[in-house]
Swiss-Prot record:
Chlorophyll a' binds at residue 666. The chain crosses the membrane at residues 61-84, 147-170, 186-210, 282-300, 337-360, 376-402, 424-446, 522-540, 580-601, 655-677, 715-720. It comes from Sequoia sempervirens. P700 is a chlorophyll a/chlorophyll a' dimer, A0 is one or more chlorophyll a, A1 is one or both phylloquinones and FX is a shared 4Fe-4S iron-sulfur center. It comes from the Eukaryota. Chlorophyll a binds at residues 674, 682. SUPFAM superfamilies: Photosystem I subunits PsaA/PsaB. This is Photosystem I P700 chlorophyll a apoprotein A1. [4Fe-4S] cluster binds at residues 564, 573.
């Protein structure tokens, strides 16, 4: 056994906590000017700047992860505690179609109690849109007591995480070799976290969630349903609902697995009672995922001479046109955590955006699809998180290029080849952006002009000149028809959005129906393509030119963030890798705004709405998307103004909080422009006048005030 920890490397002491800036020689001296506090914040978690010792940096990052997990558990505990203490969860569980979820009651201070709207069932509070109630029901929570217990459990886990963070930094800190043992890490993460994690969740779903939800769907009072541990301990209870449970594990070991198809199903579509995915489908899914990951977690070579070796795989990975291929990348990914993080963020960010799209097209929890506010919030939330992670990927890729890239070890491999033809990449991408920008915007301008001239027959629309998204429609159609060939026992396709005419409504509200795509979607999809390509252009240019450019050949010496290349070199401001991340963030915001607008209007126009006894669907905005969203004027008038006016005029009602937030958000946005539009010199002059006045009155501060640096000002601006 290899000993891969060091015992008692750093003694535990609170002394450093009393010395702000202890991690930096310069900052530890204390403040001379007000810039000190900004540098303190900028560098406190920049472990690279504290030491060059990769082992020490790795330990700090590892330890910080436990701190992060502790915070997450505390936050989660708070959510569950609110559900237990301040919510109408039990009432909602009894009647989820008429009662809205609420877990916050505003205290009557200076009239704020106006925010407590009537959410049904005699409960007054703020309606929540986080989806927690739906998750709780799906996992089989039937009482507020269970929420209390889970909240306490989360706090215990938080304490464990805090202890682990301390222990693995101060008592038993891993050696560098442990952090670099990628095969062992892959085996443990794949088999342990993802494999056993999915397996335990599948077990919970089968033994606890499924029976409880089966009874809830049948209309049994939550108070009459047996408690979770009773289902686990008493097999008879489960056998009443799923007779094959009486046979135990015999069918498993005799390979007669179809016996289990009562609770491990492959139905497709949605449960008509709840409007969510069949929970028997999701249990089956998690079991299958668990098997895959448990196998994957045994594929990498560690102590025995079988299995994959990452270094060998990467070095063998050469194509006919790619030079040395992946040679040298193994060394990068085991010595630069920025490079590793960049890849992980890019993948996790993309995955998060995929999750955003699955939350509405395959709503995973009961009664989620008919809770429109929550659907909108979850989509927005996952799109934003995904956007931040992808921009973060570019940021850390650029930091890797500046701090960790060693050109002498990377010759003619893929990274080197990409860097050598970066001009071709960036100029082609730039051309793509110009093309997409002019053409997508041009289609709208054309429509606005024709509309203004009263020539509807000359517009691009479903009723005039059609630009149908034929490829998207083909994909939809293929997926709608696929199950009949690939899964003959399935009753529906993976998602109702593909087509096929099915409609699921719960409590006279539409849960989901086939989403039609037309000219309007074709137009806005090209705006999506445009904004995404511009974001990529800015971020990729920042990474590829992080070390050098024709303008500043020695850029790497200036670091990741710098305002300009010194005095006497005009036109070299705002070229640092940091500035590219800054600009990329703005375009990420642009891109996501259009996505959220598109989703919000499309769903209200073509999916969400009420259904009459005769089966007639009335959509929230009456299906106006196809004809209104094809002009810029239509977006402004029929979406932005039509939706915002209700919020703006909300004062005096329980919605007023949203009106104030709306106003406040625009105030914050305007505040950000103050930092972005004014120059540093302006503020420095102003400060010096004010300091002069203080000197006159002999109240001058010991710490000299200074204007924000250019980079700091832009950081404050983009944050707001």
């Amino acid at each position: 056994i290899k000993i891969v920890v060091e015992r008692d490397p750093i003694k535990t002491s609170f002394e450093k906590w009393a010395k702000p800036g202890h991690f930096s020689k310069t900052l530890a001296k204390g403040p001379n000017t007000t810039t000190w506090i900004w540098n303190l914040h900028a560098d406190a978690h920049d472990f690279d700047s504290h030491t060059n010792d990769l082992e020490e940096i790795s330990r700090k990052v590892f330890s910080a992860h436990f701190g992060q997990l502790a915070i997450i558990f505390i936050w989660l505990s708070g959510m569950y505690f609110h559900g237990a203490r301040f919510s109408n969860y039990e009432a909602w569980l009894g009647d989820p179609t008429h009662i809205k979820p609420s877990a916050q009651v505003v205290w009557p201070i200076v009239g704020q109690e106006i925010l407590n709207g009537d959410v049904g069932g005699g409960f007054r509070g703020i309606q929540i849109t986080s989806g927690f109630f739906q998750i709780w029901r799906a996992s089989g929570i039937t009482s507020e007591l269970q929420l209390y217990c889970t909240a306490i459990g989360a706090l215990i886990f938080a304490a464990l995480m805090l202890f682990a963070g301390w222990f693995h930094y101060h008592k038993a800190a891993p050696k560098l070799a442990w952090f670099q043992d990628v095969e062992s890490m892959l085996n443990h993460h794949l088999a342990g976290l993802l494999g056993l994690g999915s397996l335990s969740w599948a077990g919970h779903q089968i033994h606890v969630s499924l029976p409880i939800n089966e009874l809830l769907d049948a209309g049994v009072d939550p108070k009459e349903i047996p408690l979770p541990h009773e289902f686990i301990l008493n097999r008879e209870l489960l056998a009443q609902l799923y007779p094959s449970f009486a046979k135990g594990l015999t069918p498993f070991f005799t390979l007669n697995w179809s016996e289990y198809s009562e609770f491990l199903t492959f139905r497709g579509g949605l449960n008509p009672v709840t409007g969510g995915l069949w929970l028997t489908d999701t249990a089956h899914h998690h079991l299958a995922i668990a098997i895959l990951f448990l196998i994957a977690g045994h594929m990498y070579r560690t102590n025995w001479s079988i299995g994959h070796n990452l270094k060998e795989i990467l070095e063998a990975h050469k194509g006919p046109f790619t030079g040395e291929g992946h040679r040298g990348l193994y060394e990068i990914l085991t010595t630069s955590w920025h490079a590793q993080l960049a890849l992980n963020l890019a993948m996790l960010g993309s995955l998060t955006i995929v999750v955003a799209h699955h939350m509405y097209s395959m709503p995973p929890y009961p009664y989620l699809a008919t809770d429109y506010g929550t659907q909108l919030s979850l989509f927005t939330h996952h799109m934003w998180i995904g956007g931040f992670l992808i921009v973060g990927a570019a940021a850390h890729a650029a930091i890797f290029m500046v701090r960790d890239y060693d050109p002498t070890t990377q010759y003619n491999n893929l990274l080197d080849r990409v860097l050598r033809h970066r001009d071709a990449i960036v100029s082609h991408l730039n051309w793509a952006c110009i093309f997409l920008g002019f053409h997508s915007f041009g289609l709208y301008i054309h429509n606005d002009t024709m509309s203004a001239l009263g020539r509807p027959k000359d517009m691009f629309s479903d009723t005039a000149i059609q630009l149908q998204p034929i490829f998207a429609q083909w994909i939809q159609n293929t997926h709608a028809l696929a199950p009949s060939l690939t899964a003959p026992d399935a009753t529906a396709s993976t998602s109702l959005t593909w087509g096929g005419g099915d409609l699921v409504a719960v409590g006279a509200k539409v849960a989901l129906l086939p989403i039609p795509l037309g000219t309007a979607d074709f137009l806005v999809h090209h705006i999506h393509a445009f904004t995404i390509h511009v974001t990529v252009l800015i971020l990729l240019k920042g990474v590829l030119f992080a070390r050098s450019s024709r303008l500043i050949p020695d850029k790497v010496n200036l670091g990741f963030r710098f305002p300009c290349d010194g005095p006497g070199r005009g036109g070299t401001c705002q070229v640092s890798a940091w500035d590219h991340v800054f600009l990329g963030l703005f375009w990420m915001y642009n891109a996501i705004s259009v996505v959220i607008f598109h989703f919000s209007w499309k769903m209200q126009s073509d999916v969400w709405g009420s259904i009459s006894d005769q089966g007639v669907v009335t959509h929230i905005t009456g299906g106006n998307f196809a004809q209104s969203s094809i002009t810029i004027n239509g977006w402004l008038r029929d979406f932005l103004w039509a939706q915002a006016s209700q919020v703006i005029q909300s004062y005096g009602s329980s919605l007023s909080a949203y009106g104030l937030l709306f106003l406040g958000a625009h105030f914050v946005w305007a505040f950000s422009l103050m930092f972005l539009f004014s120059g540093r010199g302006y503020w420095q002059e102003l400060i010096e006048s004010i300091v002069w006045a203080h000197n006159k009155l002999k109240v001058a501060p010991a710490i000299q005030p200074r204007a924000l640096s250019i980079v700091q000002g832009r950081a404050v601006g983009v944050a707001h």
